[in-house]
């Protein structure tokens, strides 16, 4: 059986073709994101999802906000189906970091420390100060320490603890083991410890091998350990 590797650019073409078919055959408008994005801004899925379902009636009527395929005026069918997004990207790793606290606020603080988007800059450097804005009226963000990551803090009833929940959108920029160490460091700076982790879904084998090699070296042990 003949097999070959598909390049991301080829996947992007296929993603756009699929998005067009979904729009034409199912009448569900589609945004294209990541490698399939038609504009630089839409590489970020969060931009495509901006405002979520409630914002769709307005977005459908604006040329700069409308879906890439199947854009039309808001109607009863759209009210039922909404829109969808199709993209081409590398593996996304979804991981959760368990914390020895029940405080969602502290978990969020750690998430804001590390996620690429960071947190709003506030007047006087106070956590309760008013968000600072630029000349365009947009909130000024203080970037976090980990590129290509998104994160939030929440409380898990099942475990009775708070977590930092993270998506790593580019493992070539921020490998899993780097994210783990950085979350541990930022948690420790706030008097909190990471007590465990969860991986949600599939991850590449090389991610685990890289993590194993990294921590063996950190322990000053041979990387040849089976």
Residue ranges and their predicted role:
Residues 2-6:
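Short, small-residue-biased leader/transition segments that mark boundaries at the very start
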Residues 7-226:
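Long, contiguous binding/interaction regions
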């Amino acid at each position: 059986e003949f097999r070959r590797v598909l390049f991301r650019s080829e996947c992007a073409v296929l993603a756009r073709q699929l998005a067009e078919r979904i729009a034409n055959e199912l009448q569900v408008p589609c945004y294209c994101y990541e490698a399939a994005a038609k504009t630089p801004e839409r590489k970020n899925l969060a931009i495509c999802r901006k405002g979520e379902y409630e914002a769709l009636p307005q977005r459908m009527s604006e040329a700069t906000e409308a879906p890439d395929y199947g854009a039309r005026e808001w109607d009863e069918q759209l009210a039922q189906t909404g829109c969808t997004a199709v993209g081409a990207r590398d593996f996304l790793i979804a991981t959760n970091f368990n914390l020895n606290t029940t405080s969602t606020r502290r978990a969020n603080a750690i998430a804001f420390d590390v996620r690429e988007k960071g947190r709003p800059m506030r007047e006087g450097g106070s956590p309760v100060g008013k968000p600072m804005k630029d000349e365009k009226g947009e909130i000024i963000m203080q970037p976090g320490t980990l590129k290509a990551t998104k994160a939030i803090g929440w409380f898990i009833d099942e475990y009775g603890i708070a977590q930092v929940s993270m998506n790593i959108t580019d493992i070539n920029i921020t490998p899993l083991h780097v994210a783990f160490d950085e979350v541990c460091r930022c948690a420790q700076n706030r008097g909190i410890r990471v007590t465990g982790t969860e991986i949600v879904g599939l991850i590449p084998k090389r991610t685990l091998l890289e993590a194993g090699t990294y921590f063996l070296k950190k322990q000053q042990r041979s990387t040849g350990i089976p």
